[in-house]
Amino acid sequence: MERVRGASSSDSVATLHGDHNYHCMATFKLDCTSARTRGVVSILEHRDPATVDDIFMQRVCHDINDVLRPVECLTSFPEYRRTLRVAVEAATELHGVSALSGQLTKFLEDHDGAMLPLAWPPNRYLRLTSGRKLGYLDVAEKLRKEYPMCNGPLEVLGVILGPGQSLYSDQHPVLLMGLTGTIFLHARGRPVWSPDYDPERDADRLFLAAESLQSFGREGLCRCDNVYTEDGGAPYATPEDPVLKNIVFTPHLGGKALHQQICKIKGHTWYLNGCPGMLKDRVFVATPDIPPFVRHVNLELFGHRFLPIGRVTRSPEDPECEMFIMVDAGGAIYGHMLDSGKVRRLADNFDQFMRMGTRRVISISRWLREVVSTPSTRRPRLGPRTTGSFS
């Protein structure tokens, strides 16, 4: 995997306190954009955040409803559109083979060297090979022991390569599949004896790439959340604290219960992950308070379907709100976009929201239009039938 040396720590501090320009990457970089990785990426292009956000919101979900990561933010979106169909077909075929007991390893060895295109990033391929041929069986076993969330043995699927790259370089990431079908990416670390070795950036890391091979086919590597060993893994942008643990570890946390907990911790803040390849961290401020006009719009359009639980800002010191965060009765998280007035589904629950931030944006403008033209006694359904409302 290509490694890009980053900016100084002073630049990172400057970014933390107000420099929120996007730093778009042309290189293949898999670090999540949390506070841990500010200043690490190559500064190849500067964009106004408002412009990029606007383009993202215009493009998202217009044609590809299932691809909900921030692929649309990236400069490679046209290439992604062209590659998507082939990538999905290849991943679907591989998924079919993996469902046959004991056949996956044989398939990988029979098709050793086959190159399957990734949906993202552009010009990257999964070069099929087995753990035995790659000499990776011991490494896979070591990862299984170090990362409890892997939950069983890991099967090597292949190596991520670009055009003309050699299989035998130890810098290329290795794709693995867990026992339950979860896809992981192992970024092999640089040798510790390298002159400029940095343990924070150059140690080997494990990423959660996708929940399944089907998701991997649609998304490629645009997710790649960090995986940690503590408590079986927690890819949050902010360190876990007792308040966060108390919320996310509460079983069957519904919307009303979450709203009540938010009321108790009013003003608490956490960092949220931004888009892969961009310095776009955001801060979630837990608060049940929203301006009267926002409350009025929500009541007018949705009745008592949502309860406010907070807002998203650019930094802890920045009072300007980018998005108000709401929860429905089933615990799903929604964002009210102030610039467009749209309400978009962000996550299935609060834990997922804390992991994904505002990266996963599902447009519900279709239902929004239906609400406007539908009598208040027949409001359209915005989620699972079990969601209900707070009335």
From Swiss-Prot:
One cellular component term (GO) for this entry is: host cell nucleus
Q: Name one GO biological process term.
A: symbiont-mediated perturbation of host cell cycle G0/G1 transition checkpoint
| Top-rank taxon, per record | Viruses
Keywords in alphabetical order, please.
Answer: Early protein, G0/G1 host cell cycle checkpoint dysregulation by virus, Host cytoplasm, Host nucleus, Host-virus interaction, Modulation of host cell cycle by virus
- Locations listed in the record: Host cytoplasm; Host nucleus
Nucleotide-binding keyword on record: no
The principal localisation class reads host cell
Mitochondrion: is it a keyword of this entry? no
The UniProt family comment states: Belongs to the herpesviridae US22 family.
State the protein's purpose.
Answer: Involved in the reactivation of latent MCMV in spleen cells.
The name on file for this protein is Immediate-early protein 2
Query: The organism's lineage?
Result: Viruses, Duplodnaviria, Heunggongvirae, Peploviricota, Herviviricetes
Name the gene for this chain. IE2
